[in-house]
Amino acid sequence: MEQIDKQKIADAVKVILEAVGENPEREGLIDTPMRVARMYEEVFAGLKKDPSVHFDTIFEEQHEELVLVKDIRFSSMCEHHLVPFFGVAHVAYLPQNGRVAGLSKLARVVDDVSRRPQLQERITTTVAEIMMEKLKPLGVMVIMEAEHMCMTIRGVNKPGTKTITSAVRGAFKNDDKLRSEVLALIKHN
C-alpha cells in the first residue's frame, strides 16, 4: 500500500488554520501542519495493514473452552468528524478442534482495524468477521465500549457518554448461557 502523503496533509492543515483565521506562521503553529501529518500517519497506520495476517499462525491445543481477552484499550478516528474515539474491546471466542491464536493477536487485530478513519460499529463487526474466517471457531463475541469526542466536545456536548457495540457469531448467538458467561466475565474484575 502506498505511503501517507505527509506533505499534502501538512499543506491542507495550513489551509485549515488560515480558514479559521489563524496565522500558521506564528510561533506556536509554525510546525503544527507537519506534526498533524505525522500524527495522521500514526493514527491511520491500519490503512496500510491487513489485520487478518495476525491469524496466519494458529496453534493446535487441547482447549475447546471459552477464550476471552478483555479490556483491550483502543483508539480510532471517527470518519464523520475526524476526531478521536477511544475505549476498550472485549474479544471472546470458542475454539473448534483445538485451534487457538496467540492472545496478543486478538489485541493486534483490534489495533489494526481501529487505526483508520472508522466507525465503532464497523470495527466491532470486522474483528468478529476476521476471527470467524481465520480461526474457524464455534463462535465469536466482540463487545466494544468507547467515548466519542464527536459527542463530547461538539454537537450534544455529553462528556462521559459511552457507546457500546457488539458482534455475536456462531455458538454465542444461539446459546444464552454461553453469552451470559462472557458478559459475567467481562463485568468481573
UniProtKB/Swiss-Prot annotation:
SUPFAM superfamilies of this UniProt entry?
Tetrahydrobiopterin biosynthesis enzymes-like
Q: Which PROSITE patterns match?
A: GTP_CYCLOHYDROL_1_1, GTP_CYCLOHYDROL_1_2
What is the phylogenetic placement of the source species in the record?
A: Bacteria, Bacillati, Bacillota, Bacilli, Bacillales
Q: What is the name of this protein?
A: GTP cyclohydrolase 1
Its transmembrane ranges are none
Task: Give the EC number(s) listed in the UniProt record.
Answer: 3.5.4.16
Gene3D superfamilies in alphabetical order: 1.10.286.10, 3.30.1130.10
UniProt source species? Listeria monocytogenes serotype 4b (strain CLIP80459)
The family line of this record is:
Belongs to the GTP cyclohydrolase I family.
